[in-house]
Amino acid sequence: GLKERGIDAKFCATGQTGIMLEGSGYPMDRVIADFISGAAEQLVLENEHHDVLLIEWQGSLVHPSYSAVTLGILHGSAPHALVLCYEVLRDKVTGVEHVAIPALPQIRRIFEVLSNVHQPCEVIGVSMNSRRVSEADAHV
């Protein structure tokens, strides 16, 4: 990881599980919507003395129920780079099965367009959940 390479990195939790693991952070799903961006910005400001901040995401920009939280964190944290989390073969939004999940290239474009509002930002990686495919297919 980053710390093993001598990089001063900090995980900034935005959900209850992340807070339990890290010991600090803000539970963004409990913040009033008008203040999510400010809470994300405050989380960054409190930890800006580190070289790299890894901001935990909540929800998804393509989930109609939780996209406001995701967008608030995105704009408030003003990232320089993103790592997308993607589940292979998942084509419907959980809990709202009539809503299709776009293909990964389209999700990447959505995130990059919305993250470039304040400063340059790009997707630098994908964390892939491959539980629905074989190990051989996951390595393709």
Give short role names for the model-derived ranges.
Residues G1-V140:
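Flexible phosphate-sensing "switch/lid" loops adjacent to ATP/NTP-binding sites
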